[in-house]
Amino acid sequence: MDPNIMWQARNDGSGLLEEDIQQLRSSIRGTVVLKNEASEEEYNAAVTRWNNVSIRLATLVVYVEDEQDIVKCVEFVNKHYLDVAVCSHGRHSYHGASSSTGMVIDLGRMRKVSVDKEAMTVTAQGGCIARDVELPLEAEGLAAVFGAVNETGVGFLTGAHGLAADNLVSARMVLANGQVVTASDDENSDLFWAIRGAGPNFGIVTEFKYRVHKQGPVFWQMLFYSPDKLKDCVSIVNQMHNISLAQKGGDFQVMMCYLTPPGYPDLHPGLRIFYNGPEEKAKELAAPAYALGPLSVSGGMCSFSDTTRIPPYLEFEGFDRYAASSAHLDYPLDEDLLLEVFTMFRNVIHKYGHHLLHPSKCILDLRNYEKVASVPIDATAYSGRFDVAWMIPDLQWDDPAMDSTMRMEVTSITAHIRERVREAKGDHVSGPRDATAIYPNISAGGEEKAKSVFGPNLPRLRVLKRKYDPNFIWNKWFPIVPA
């Protein structure tokens, strides 16, 4: 059956009777917020997201308290054939955690964490945010790799330890039929393979168990340069990446950004330096960046958890509407193309003036992905196992009337990059990837994008989708059509 027809056929919940809602409420410990019953304040709080573009007006939102609540919600969804979305904390630029019809299952109250220092693991419930896990780990001198865990999870420890998905030991899940299972190398190994990259297609994880690592203080510094040094910054990006690769432990990581820092009237290039070690060594490795003469320098030695906080130069009141896209670039990076892209981004910023100027940014991710690339492409569902750079234009604005325009502008930049990559490659494809491969955290949405994210693993995923979700209940993020 066509997936769009399968989704559209789902009930929006408007026909639910009062007795249906009462039955749901009496079966769970959590709270049901009903669109036409709750106060405006209560309902708005239930559907608000970090990205206001992602707000959808669901018929009901259920704040679950435990795993059994989730089971009852899934049973209710099946009984009434409702559309359903799952919200862990709602902090994502895409709207996969929202539903314009049916039910949202909100995991935000499920935030328990336990650390097993002897086994070097941490167990965290599905509603946890990064700091819920980072702080108890930090107290034990430990850390884990974190990122957008509904897909793969990339962080500044990825160079040393791989993706969050590569450090997943096991997961407890509620499947589409309401069954609770454990997925690991030893139990339901096919499901475990699938959720490491395609998790939103297969169920709701109530509990993750991750491998953790010993962790001390790190060096974390942001260098901003005057606008006229954009070309100089671009001229050292290949050198900085090569320095990162030379550190075999993956401890030295660099990112470039192009944004308007607080107190400045226009875009400035910047380099973010991370080193999992002492300041003296960090500055030695990053010498080319300091030699350019930064306009300002902030940061230094800090705890690892400090690196995951939103930095002051990205904190702005309002501007709570987001659009981001991504495209990969092969090394050695084409400096002329990078300057083209930064110029396109600057033109967009200047075109829309005060709507975009301060919070918007363009990021060039130069982090070392050799550890990620060392894992065979068929070892997990995620197929993006290669060491490339990622260009990520990210626009923020505050006027809802500009939503579609901003989405068009941001995707036009990455479309240009992909076209240039295609031109450079011609008909040649290196291994299992192609010129359209995308960064899943940024480019969620739609079956076509699923093909790019999962590549040669998609046929197997479609077979597993038929096994674990034949009725296409889980149809958000990167919806995989059952075989």
From Swiss-Prot:
Pathway: Pigment biosynthesis; Secondary metabolite biosynthesis. Its EC number is 1.1.1.-. This is FAD-linked oxidoreductase pgmH. FAD-linked oxidoreductase; part of the gene cluster that mediates the biosynthesis of pleosporalin A, ascomycone A, as well as a third cryptic naphthoquinone derived pigment, all responsible for the coloration of conidia. Essential for the production of pleosporalin A, but not the 2 other final products. The pathway begins with the biosynthesis of the cyclized heptaketide 3-acetonyl-1,6,8-trihydroxy-2-naphthaldehyde by the NR-PKS pgmA. Its cofactor is FAD. Belongs to the oxygen-dependent FAD-linked oxidoreductase family. Keywords: FAD, Flavoprotein, Oxidoreductase.
